[in-house]
Amino acid sequence: MPIDSKNIHHETNKLLSAALEIESDEITEDLHIDNTPSWDSFGHLRLVVGIESKFNVQLKPTEIESILDYQSIYAIVDRFINE
């Protein structure tokens, strides 16, 4: 299924679920690095690798540092979809 604006939330949720090893029903717009125990350094690394693999890109260090919550991940995924 191609990624577009209609299924961006679905694809973002799949990335989060796999990287943070959480169930899809645990993913809400309130998801944040501070309120998700599995979002440790390894979870963050899995998330970055997942984004880079899915979109065949390399995130800049500033982008990696900016990934702190659902909205920031969604914004990055949205940007890659619309490039």
Question: Would you name each region that the model predicts?
Answer:
Residues 2-48, 53-83:
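Phosphopantetheine-dependent thiolation modules in NRPS/PKS and related acyl-activating systems
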